[in-house]
Amino acid sequence: MASPRLGTFCCPTRDAATQLVLSFQPRAFHALCLGSGGLRLALGLLQLLPGRRPAGPGSPATSPPASVRILRAAAACDLLGCLGMVIRSTVWLGFPNFVDSVSDMNHTEIWPAAFCVGSAMWIQLLYSACFWWLFCYAVDAYLVIRRSAGLSTILLYHIMAWGLATLLCVEGAAMLYYPSVSRCERGLDHAIPHYVTMYLPLLLVLVANPILFQKTVTAVASLLKGRQGIYTENERRMGAVIKIRFFKIMLVLIICWLSNIINESLLFYLEMQTDINGGSLKPVRTAAKTTWFIMGILNPAQGFLLSLAFYGWTGCSLGFQSPRKEIQWESLTTSAAEGAHPSPLMPHENPASGKVSQVGGQTSDEALSMLSEGSDASTIEIHTASESCNKNEGDPALPTHGDL
């Protein structure tokens, strides 16, 4: 489970709200986290085993677009963060005496404290970076549709994702563990920077990504209508695929992380009470404990559920997956080429304008393919479809494709 509370566990002088969830069935909780994390890693490996659509021998060897690199970075962060959860839960279950020394009020041993702080910061840093990468994906999707940019900004995405995540994580840890791990300062003013590290990018993804996705869907509709001046059934289907995909992404994020926001709100509310053990606060304590266990189940599941949202099931053939609905990229490109035939009433001697139009059309196809499929295969399909159109270059009515 990815929560800033993992870092406060390392402080012997932890607050009462943190102690409430820490002391509630700790072995059952870590066993649940271990099982959920192990299941996520196993399903993730099944997703990677066979390739769904291997590229043909004649496929162009092009570098992956920026969105694919962003998704790979987000997946790597999630995978490593989940691995950190599994290792931490394994140590908590297998070496209870090693962990108990962290809670010693008189003295804190160096190695248990180092493992506690290191594993907590590892999990928090990687999941924070994962959220920043998901925000970069939404930004890149919008920029690609608006101005066909992406690869040129991948370095900026790396700086923003890793730089902001590292900066916030280091600052939060320095404030939380001041002056030392064994004598952490109590109070919200020291803990708030630590919580900002995790919840700032999470809230940014939950609030800003839907806005960017909606703007992207609107821009996609305008792009599809502007290519031929009409909105065909095939193009309407393409726009619907992109819209549904964005909806699935946000649904997974809300399902996996809403419990964290609810739990943290309840614990902050308890911290502001003079006595959290009061009878009137029993429903709040019960809700906090319940959402704490829900977090242990849903947080590690994010990576696998996002892979389903992006690509569907791509792993071992289990015999029950439904056939995928492919978009007719070839017919789209062909129809665009047919729309480029000059009218008998129009002059024929302007190949440059036809070439620019066709290049722009191919770029928009690649952008749409990148959003609807999110893999290299979709871009390859478009190149294949474009090559099939290039075979008709002998026809003077067909404009030639330019190199991108």
From Swiss-Prot:
Keyword set includes Acyltransferase: no
Species assigned in the record: Homo sapiens (Human)
Gene Ontology BP, a term: melanosome transport
Name of the molecule in the record: G-protein coupled receptor 143
Comment field on protein domains: The cytoplasmic domain 3 and the C-terminus tail domain contain the lysosomal sorting signals and are necessary and sufficient for intracellular retention and delivery to lysosomal and melanosomal, respectively in melanocytic and non-melanocytic cells.
Region named Necessary for its G protein-activation ability and normal distribution of melanosomes: 221-238
Tissue/organ expression: Expressed at high levels in the retina, including the retinal pigment epithelium (RPE), and in melanocytes. Weak expression is observed in brain and adrenal gland.
Residue ranges that the UniProt entry lists as topological domain Extracellular: 1-28, 100-124, 171-191, 270-292
Effect after changing E235K: In OA1; not delivered at the cell surface of melanocytic and non-melanocytic cells
Disorder: Albinism ocular 1: Form of albinism affecting only the eye. Pigment of the hair and skin is normal or only slightly diluted. Eyes may be severely affected with photophobia and reduced visual acuity. Nystagmus or strabismus are often associated. The irides and fundus are depigmented. Nystagmus 6, congenital, X-linked: A form of nystagmus, a condition defined as conjugated, spontaneous and involuntary ocular oscillations that appear at birth or during the first three months of life. Other associated features may include mildly decreased visual acuity, strabismus, astigmatism, and occasionally head nodding.
